[in-house]
Amino acid sequence: MKLYNFWRSGTSHRLRIALNLKGVPYEYLAVHLGKEEHLKDAFKALNPQQLVPALDTGAQVLIQSPAIIEWLEEQYPTPALLPADADGRQRVRALAAIVGCDIHPINNRRILEYLRKTFGADEAAINAWCGTWISAGFDAYEALLAVDPKRGRYSFGDTPTLADCYLVPQVESARRFQVDLTPYPLIRAVDAACGELDAFRRAAPAAQPDSA
């Protein structure tokens, strides 16, 4: 498989984690967003949306990290990223959606570039923007962890799930945008537990060949 991605991209990061947890090997192909390589015709031919990540399976090119991770779960069911029961799966998907639907979309690179170019937002304004929405999402995530009677080392129980694939990259982003994580001890504990696993360490932005 060929993974078209960018080292600092949160969506790329979450997919790298999922691939590593599943033990699925892939060829790393860097698409430099800062150099606008994703806007070139060659990449547009792969992914008309011109976003990373994209996963070339040899038979097709998959886009959109949530859909790709669900595809991986179906194609490579072991180890599972979703619980066996419907209630557990709903909870894990809800946690992932807090990040994937409510936090990340309004804090991704193209939104921030639009704020800079159209409204003249400086770095302080960008950090304030990101901090507002990250904190709102983390408030909910932390509260859900706090009331979960089955909470373990990770977001759900004692094995990594889909939720952790989403959470860890968002914590990385929060630190980059100088968000105060003091109010989120449970999130920080989950992030630390994930950081002990090789699958997460190998997926980290700083560990990628195109990191800068």
UniProtKB/Swiss-Prot annotation:
CDD domains to which the protein is assigned, alphabetical: GST_C_Zeta (cd03191), GST_N_Zeta (cd03042)
Keyword Hydrolase part of the UniProt annotation: no
GO cellular component, one term: cytoplasm
Substrates-to-products reaction catalysed: 3-maleylpyruvate = 3-fumarylpyruvate
A Pfam family: GST_C_2
Sequence ranges assigned to domain GST N-terminal in this UniProt record: 1-80
Domain GST C-terminal: 85-212
Gene Ontology BP terms: glutathione metabolic process; L-phenylalanine catabolic process; naphthalene catabolic process
Documented EC number(s): 5.2.1.4
NCBIfam families per the UniProt record, alphabetical: maiA
Purpose: Catalyzes the GSH-dependent isomerization of maleylpyruvate to fumarylpyruvate which is subsequently processed by NagK to form pyruvate and fumarate.
Protein name, entry field: Maleylpyruvate isomerase
Organism: Ralstonia sp
